[in-house]
Regions:
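Transmembrane helical elements of multi-pass membrane transporters/channels
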Residues: 85-105, 226, 230-233, 237, ...
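Helix-loop junctions and terminal segments of transmembrane helices
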Residues: 134-151, 278, 339-363, 430-431
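Interhelical loop/hinge segments that connect adjacent transmembrane helices in multipass membrane
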Residues: 59, 65-83, 192, 224-228, ...
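Membrane-interface junctions at transmembrane-helix termini in multi-pass inner-membrane proteins
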Residues: 206-229, 359, 414-441
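Membrane-water interface segments that mark the loop-to-transmembrane alpha-helix transition
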Residues: 85-98, 123, 128, 132-181, ...
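Signature of the first transmembrane helix
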Residues: 53-61, 65, 79-139, 300-326, ...
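Interfacial segments at transmembrane-helix termini and the short loops linking adjacent helices
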Residues: 76, 180-200, 326, 388-420
Length: 505
């Protein structure tokens, strides 16, 4: 889900007929999971035999029967269709919103001053940073668990997660308002007057709500709901900017109004999630508290891991807002938006991988063999095109963006290949139930990336920030690559059923 300003990243899958996802249970607070191994929660614990083992002479051992080749081919085809159905909806949503978002930014950069675009980008970066902190892992928890819950519990689980995350972001945004006079010139806009302050708070909370909605749609395999919400938001934003131009309100607060208002209106798509009404008594406060306790630990594990990998984007945007003047920030924000739009398809491959693997290690191996080469190939092609065509792309936004943004765009796209490796590493560790280990590794990597971007920005400005980030991310990817290649090359052993029965004799 992209940002609300110019700086913006049980059943069958909708449209497919693959086998249903295995149901997954989520542990309570007392559950324990051995690092490095799949627990019964994540992968399903092997059930014991239904009857007592027979005495050896009474049970002739038959050779293991190999599954029929046609059945195996049909199962593999269903896996592939399900994976790329989820991926297809993600691409459609991002493609539609990207085209409309770029159109919006092209209009804004031509009709609004670079300073106003930069100030709106600073507010946007701050809002998305608050959303990253206030999410508490709830959006990713909904991706992983919502589809496997009983139908009657889905609405109350979704709404409880929405309330908690939005309330957290509301508190954080109010705190940011109080501190904004001390956060640099680009961020002082959010407390310039009461109207702008209200728009900032509403936009921050609505950004969190939209992120929660989109992830719930992925978890429920309601890709069309995510597609419609994102498209409606982007189309309305473009229309509101047109109205602002007609009435002469070409200011940074006007851009904030367009983004906040359209995010709120896009929630009319909530019925498209097709959530059943909550049974009487299931939506009361005590039941919601019980849900929060049940899923709290797992959600926070997702949150720590998500912060350790995705917080880099928000922190880099915040670093730019603190170190770069508003005009330069507009050029950086535009280059970053173009880069994130171009690189979203490789990222969505990894997200589809996480949504479909369901803790099945053999399925994980097969899907990684599909998504990793495709992601790297797409990313490599995008880098080549961007290095050559960067000035032509930025010309859409005006001559100033070509002059001052081309180098930034060429450096930023070099981050893309590293993130294909990072995103696959995270999806693999989640499937293996090794959230704690992955969080530590990714936290260290995030510190390296942030340090590279900050040092580059301090000493060499916008160009140094982009170059420092690209170098640090590439070094991190080199460290993570062996773990990804192990899953890519090695299929986990599967113990034949007949061997299991013989061992019980």
């Amino acid at each position: 889900m992209k940002s609300w300003g110019p700086l913006s990243r049980h059943g069958t899958a909708e449209g497919g007929r693959g086998p249903p996802r295995p149901a997954r249970r989520t542990p309570g607070l007392s559950s324990h999971q051995v690092p490095g191994r799949m627990s019964g929660v994540a992968a399903g614990k092997p059930a014991g035999p239904a009857e007592q083992p027979l005495v050896a002479p009474e049970l002739p051992v038959q050779p293991a029967e190999r599954p029929s080749q046609p059945s195996d081919l049909r199962a593999r085809a269903a896996e592939l269709r399900r994976l790329f159905t989820t991926f297809g909806y993600l691409v459609a949503k991002q493609g539609a919103t990207a085209v409309l978002g770029l159109a919006y930014l092209a209009v804004a950069t031509h009709l609004f001053s670079a300073r106003d675009v930069g100030l709106a980008a600073a507010a946007s970066s701050t809002a998305f940073f608050l959303g990253a902190i206030g999410a508490l892992g709830i959006p990713l928890l909904l991706v992983a668990e919502l589809g496997s819950l009983p139908v009657a519990l889905r609405r109350v689980t979704f709404s409880t997660g929405m309330y908690i995350s939005c309330l957290t972001v509301l508190i954080l945004s109010l705190g940011t308002l109080a501190l904004s006079p001390f956060l640099g010139g680009s961020l002082r806009i959010i407390c310039a007057d009461s109207t702008t302050a209200v728009l900032f708070v509403i936009g921050s909370v609505a950004t969190m709500g939209a992120l929660t909605f989109d992830n719930a749609a992925i978890g429920l395999h309601r890709g069309s709901a995510q597609l419609w919400r994102g498209s409606l938001n982007s189309a309305l934003k473009l229309a509101v900017v047109g109205v602002l131009v007609l009435v002469g309100a070409r200011t940074a607060p006007g851009l904030l109004l367009a983004c906040a208002l359209t995010l709120v209106v896009s929630f009319v798509c909530i019925p498209m999630l097709r959530l059943k009404p909550t049974p009487a008594g299931e939506g009361n406060l005590s039941h919601r508290v019980a849900l929060a306790r049940r899923y709290g630990v797992l959600s926070l594990k997702h949150h720590i891991l998500n912060l350790s990998i995705n917080s880099v984007f928000y922190i880099v945007g915040l670093i730019a807002a603190l170190l770069i003047l508003p005009r330069q920030l507009a050029y950086f924000s535009t280059a970053l938006l173009v880069e994130s739009t171009a690189m979203v398809i490789p990222y969505l491959l990894a997200l589809a991988l996480f949504a479909e693997i369901s803790g099945d290690q053999s399925l994980l191996h097969r899907h990684v063999r599909r998504t990793l080469p495709l992601g790297l190939a797409l990313c490599g092609g995008i880098v080549i095109v961007a290095e050559v065509a960067a000035p032509l792309v930025l010309r859409i936004f005006g001559p100033g963006y070509v002059t001052d943004g081309t180098t930034a765009l060429r450096l930023l796209v070099l981050v893309g290949p590293a993130y294909v490796i990072k995103d696959h590493y995270v999806a693999i560790r989640r499937a293996q139930g090794r959230l704690g280990h992955a969080a530590k590794v990714m936290a260290a990597g995030t510190c390296v990336e942030v340090a590279g971007a900050a040092l580059g920005g301090i000493y060499w400005g916008m160009t140094g920030l982009c170059a420092g980030w690209a170098v640090a991310a590439s070094l991190e990817a080199v460290v993570l690559l062996p773990a990804v290649l192990r899953v890519f090359h090695r299929e986990p052993p599967v113990e034949p059923r007949s061997a299991l029965r013989v061992s019980q004799l």
